[in-house]
Structures are given as structure tokens and as C-alpha cells.
A protein has these predicted regions:
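Structured catalytic/nucleic-acid-binding cores of DNA maintenance enzymes
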Residues: 1-126
């Protein structure tokens, strides 16, 4: 299982490549992860710019204009930044497209997670 230092190294590795870029598409190749990948992702994300890439514990938070994508790497998951033209590998589960770049979740054991939390959800209310 990727431990906290590996998750931080992953954050530091992907942030310079995706921060400030607009999501052009999201492809859910196999959404059967620890929790099903929300179908709303494919409609909610395109056109939104990545504001920041943060970490809370072992979760990566990709901050967009209208919410956060929460990513957990599970037991054996990795995130890779690749050219969009690079062929998919067998265990690639979710791909975020940024024009000519792709951010791919590669998770052989399917214990990872990709979740969407819009800023309108209870997480963001200030009472």
C-alpha cells in the first residue's frame, strides 16, 4: 500500500503537470474500484481548471473550480502523467485528459478510489 511519503511524492510529481490546466475529458475505463466511480464525473469535469493538488492523509485532492476530485491509491495504485497518445495499459482504470496530457490511475487490485465532491455538498457549508 502506498504510504504517506509515497502519496506526497505522487502529489509533488503530478502537480506541476496538471495545475492550471483545463480538463478536456475524463474516461472511466473500469469504474469498479473500492467505491464505484460516480457517473457525474464525465459531465462535471470537462472545461474546469485545476486550481491546486493537495493531500490529506493518504488522499489526493485535485481542486477544481466547482469541487474536488478525491483520489486514493488503494493497495497498488499509481498515478502517471503521460502523453494522451500513449496506449492504455491493462489495469488503467480512470484517465483525466488535459489536451495532449493524460493523468492515469493504474490500479491492478481495484482498491483505489476516485470520488467527486462538488462545492455545493455539505463538506463546504459554513455553519
Amino acid at each position: 500500500m502506498p504510504e504517506l511519503p509515497e502519496v506526497e511524492v505522487t502529489r509533488l510529481g503530478i502537480a506541476p503537470h496538471i495545475q492550471g490546466r483545463a480538463v478536456s475529458a475524463i474516461n472511466v475505463i473500469d469504474g469498479r474500484l473500492r467505491w464505484p466511480v460516480p457517473k457525474s464525473l464525465t459531465k462535471a469535469l470537462p472545461g474546469q481548471r485545476v486550481q491546486a493538488v493537495e493531500r490529506r492523509g493518504k488522499y489526493l485532492l485535485v481542486e477544481l473550480e466547482t469541487g474536488h476530485i478525491l483520489i486514493h491509491l488503494g493497495m497498488t495504485g499509481t498515478l502517471r502523467v503521460l502523453p494522451s497518445s500513449e496506449p492504455l495499459k491493462l489495469h488503467d482504470r480512470v484517465t483525466l485528459e488535459f489536451g495532449k496530457l493524460s493523468l492515469r490511475l493504474h490500479d491492478p487490485r481495484k482498491f483505489g478510489a476516485v470520488l467527486w465532491h462538488p462545492k455545493t455538498c455539505l463538506l463546504y457549508t459554513s455553519d
